[in-house]
Amino acid sequence: MKSIIDVKNLSFRYKESQEYYDVKDITFHVKRGEWLSIVGHNGSGKSTTVRLIDGLLEAESGEIVIDGQRLTEENIWNIRRQIGMVFQNPDNQFVGATVEDDVAFGLENQGLSRQEMQKRVEEALDLVGMLDFKKREPARLSGGQKQRVAIAGVVALRPAILILDEATSMLDPEGRRELIETVKGIRKDYDMTVISIRHDLEEVAMSDRVLVMKKGEIESTSSPRELFSRNDLDQIGLDDPFSNQLKHSLSQNGCDLPENYLTESELEDKLWELL
């Protein structure tokens, strides 16, 4: 499968006086239609990396190629049209007086007819389950609802790439699950490439591939299942998922399970087989 993002020997530091680099000589790719999770300790370079990809920061060295185009000052705005970002705090992204106004805001500079704009707004809100709230003020929404509206604003623009930068970290467990299910549906419906930054391995399990960052460098690249089999997750800033904890506890009590399980439902199915 062809890559939609190629990052080559990328380095960046916030201040030239720094002796260390916030991102140091990293190289990786993202395939078209892939879901890539980027994980690691706070300060490992995750958010800096996606901000470099989106052109919010300028690299000191190296190159970024988006869908065959090398990111430069000349084409940065055209490339940004292919990328949609959702941040940790949705309040920072709201500009409209109502939900539908906010989703429509990004479309106003694309030369679309009013009819096409209305169609896209309604389709995007329906896709994230927020169509009934289109006349609501954003301030009156819950955290999970705000994030879904933020995603709708991105989806309405039809980007090829969706970046979630800690987008679920302020939500409760139910809100996180709902948002991740929404993203799964969007990815399927629009064949969208997804990059997500998160510490929660239950969410990481949904991805195709995981890139682990440590001190500004790429520590490893693997599948979620390979990552879950590691015994040093705490050393790379990750909590052991509940399925792994339960498997370990059962093993200590004489019930050895042969595999690593990505989700609680996978483990549940296996336990039912053993009963």
Language-model features: where?
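The feature captures the beta-strand-to-loop junction immediately N-terminal to the Walker
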Residues: 39-41
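Helix-to-loop junction immediately C-terminal to a conserved catalytic motif
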Residues: 54
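Conserved ABC transporter NBD signature motif
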Residues: 62-70, 79
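Conserved ABC ATPase "signature" region
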Residues: 115-133
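Conserved ABC ATPase signature
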Residues: 137-141, 145
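Catalytic Walker B motif of ABC-type/P-loop ATPase nucleotide-binding domains
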Residues: 162-165
